[in-house]
Amino acid sequence: MAAFDYNVKDLSLAEAGRHQIRLAEYEMPGLMQLREEYQQEQPLAGARITGSIHMTVQTAVLIETLVALGAQVRWASCNIFSTQDEAAAAVVVGPHGTPEDPQGVPVFAWKGETLEEYWDCVDKIFSWGDELPNMILDDGGDATMAVIRGKQFEEAGMVPPVEEGDSDEYQAFLGMLRKTLAEQPGKWTAIAESVKGVTEETTTGVHRLYHFAEEGVLPFPAMNVNDAVTKSKFDNKYGTRHSLIDGINRATDMLMGGKNVLICGYGDVGKGCAEAMAGQGARVKVTEADPINALQALMDGFPVVHVDQAIGDADIVITATGNMGIISFEQMLAMKDHAVLGNIGHFDNEIDMASLLHRDDVSRVTIKPQVDEFTLPNGKSIVVLSEGRLLNLGNATGHPSFVMSTSFADQTIAQIELFQNDGRYVNEVYRLPKILDEKVARIHVEALGGTITELTKEQAEYIGVDVAGPYKPEHYRY
């Protein structure tokens, strides 16, 4: 029996997961070098990290890096479909355990959770017995939101009732908080006071952090990892360029060459999507609300249109905005028969999934896991991937290991920075110091066999930088 609690699909999958983790380590030089650099120092000794990121093979390497640097960890996935069950099992069993005697860390994640199960897993990663977590590592902001809203509702003495129009997910979230307030009064307030900081992985979660800060309810310092250059300009673009195609291929077996594709959003993720589809020979159009991004799309050769102008001709529609209400039910009615609709933003509200799932005049047939055909009132069908959630993780396995090495090296460094500098940071949102961003880049340049030119002292003085960096001012746009 394990000396800790966990909830994963099947521990017998651990061996398969361990083989994949071992291979991923070779593709994740950032994390492996940080292990080597900090193993003796143990900079995270005493850290109790509540982690909420997609429970993939790459995340397993991150978790075991945090543990190698001294941290204790409890983990859940941040998406109901994104867990790789073999990775979750391998992390619970650990490098030296067996399915009969797990010696890893507590994980609460499996592919295909219900919304109620998902929020129960979030509750579990904050339950440390006689201790409290003192760090959060988040992706999308759900874990952080649980602490902040839980504390607010404890102060108010009640969880607000469900209102008409509340999403299924928000109803499940309120249900979890209602249960914890009844069974463990004061839990979230105590956690808010214990946590030294949160590091946030993704655009959507960062938006939430800034909103909490503006609202004046952020109870601890936050590090915006998403906007580290080695995250947003690599994971968001190059990772998506790889994983979007992987997800669509696994889901549909559709040839993309010659197809009409509509990409909604031309931020870093949208750029990766458009480039990937164009590389497959698709005819790509882009929608965009920001005129700067729209101009970039045009200069890159992609027509910029309104959704209504292009959705009727599109064979594939992908949302990548991080916003809500991008594709309405009325726009779905205008789509081609058997067109494919997917999302690669963090939440499912970019697409009006509520109408598809709850209208009486819409029927659903599951083709295979995370691939559903919805027949609309006009008789046409559309194929929806991962119920409007992240298709690259629901229909495939997410971004490749090497690009996640940059993001997760950023996360590890940010955790060390906040944990070791308790008191230096106030309850605001910070960005990773540029010198650390450059450190992560340098590791990966060397891993790919690149040679970085070293400035002479005179050259460095001429442009006003240190020979060792940082080489660009904070306002520089890469």
UniProtKB/Swiss-Prot annotation:
Cofactor binding: number and manner: Binds 1 NAD(+) per subunit.
Keyword NAD: yes
GO cellular component, one term: cytosol
Entry annotated with the keyword Hydrolase: yes
Pfam families, per the entry: AdoHcyase, AdoHcyase_NAD
Pathway, per record: Amino-acid biosynthesis; L-homocysteine biosynthesis; L-homocysteine from S-adenosyl-L-homocysteine: step 1/1
PROSITE patterns the record matches: ADOHCYASE_1 (PS00738), ADOHCYASE_2 (PS00739)
Binding site for NAD(+): 202-204, 236, 265-270, 288, 323, 344-346, 392
CDD domains for the chain: SAHH
Family membership noted in the UniProt record: Belongs to the adenosylhomocysteinase family.
Enzyme Commission (EC) number: 3.13.2.1
UniProt catalytic activity: S-adenosyl-L-homocysteine + H2O = L-homocysteine + adenosine
Name of this protein: Adenosylhomocysteinase
Chain residues that bind substrate: 56, 139, 201, 231, 235
Function according to Swiss-Prot or TrEMBL: May play a key role in the regulation of the intracellular concentration of adenosylhomocysteine.
Source lineage: Bacteria, Bacillati, Actinomycetota, Actinomycetes, Mycobacteriales
GO function terms (MF aspect): adenosylhomocysteinase activity
Record's subcellular location: Cytoplasm
